Amino acid sequence: MIDLAKRTERLTVVLKTNLRWILMATFVWPFGQVLAEERVQGRRSLVLENDKARLVLDIAGGSIPEFRFNDSELNPLNWGRRNPGDQPGSMGHFLCCDRWGPPSDAEGKNGMPYHGESSKVVWRVLQDTETTAAGIHARMAADLPLAGMAVDRSVTLAASSPFFVVSETITNNNKLGRIFNIVQHPTIGPPFLEENCVVDSNGRRGFAQGGLMPNPEQPEFLWPSAITKDGKKVLMRRMTDSEEPSVTSFVIDEDLGWAVASNGKRGLLFGYVWKRSDYPWFNHWWKLKDGKPHARGLEFGSTGLHQPFPVLVKKREIFGQQLFEHLDAGKNTTKSYACFLAKIPDDFAGVSKVVIDGELLLITERVRNRPRTIKIATGGLIR
């Protein structure tokens, strides 16, 4: 009887403790809710949700595999395999850090992966998640052991809007300074991506990846045009029966960079906005599968040349824009971007302009006569 009583007491304590943590992790506010770590399609995830939209953060690899309206299953970031389990993977929107593209031969032999380590490691969930009047906030971090760097990510979903902001602080933990790059790698996929899906951006001067040194930026073109290896001019707003040129990069000239994909048939618009001082390059790629659009990358970052560091150092800049950054020993730098959704009419013609006006994001339609303007509340998360 004594043993049974003690066991019952211990069980009661355990249940009370677990219940307290569950309540802390799922505390509901009138502004929205922060859900405890949960399994989404069999993977460890954080889910941030307000009354408009749902945002999923994958812990093993740090990807953002899902951002959609609550009343719809249509997820623009439906790209990459969300295999059940805890192995890191690259899905939807993932981070390339400390590089974009391949390592050098020597770095590869030492284990440095393509696009760096940030999507190849398990991220840590930091224990200061909170809900405020501004929105639902979460933090996660990753250590990059080969690079000797760390990333601390802060994510805030607006209180009642399909709009979220990500700020990432990159720290150089090495005893010496080093060069590095950071590129955001969002990729859209079907069914949102199809033939009538339109991509617009304010990227300007551009070139196709794969050109030979010392002038890989030749031939030059202007968005939304590009030139294939055969010298054919193509328009890149819509994806048709070709995936050439496969990867292209464009300099952002304005203070605010943006890239938006819209599908009137599906009634959905999805996009990003960022400061040029953080990310001066817009990098685009696309891929067909069975003759149909399969993937479109709306990438933006600190570089526009998809090469190892020795090549970047030799080239240094393209179109007057540097191809890498330097971070001194023990120092850090913070970069941010915002992502948004909007419902659109079936005859929406694409986007000509994105601006921030106070606490509103204004998206102007790409038509000459009477363009419509979409307004998205930012909650003051970006200015």
Task: Walk through the language-model features, giving the residues of each.
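Intrinsically disordered, low-complexity regulatory regions of eukaryotic regulatory proteins
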Residues: M1, R7, F31, L35-A36, ...
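N-terminal secretory signal peptides that target proteins for export/translocation
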Residues: M1-T17
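N-terminal leader/targeting segments
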Residues: R10, A25, K331-N332
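Detector for intrinsically disordered, low-structure N-terminal pre-sequences
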Residues: T12-V13, F27, Q33-L35
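Bacterial N-terminal signal peptides
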Residues: N18-P30
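Surface-exposed acidic/polar loop and edge beta-strand patches at domain peripheries
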Residues: L35-V165, N173-R383
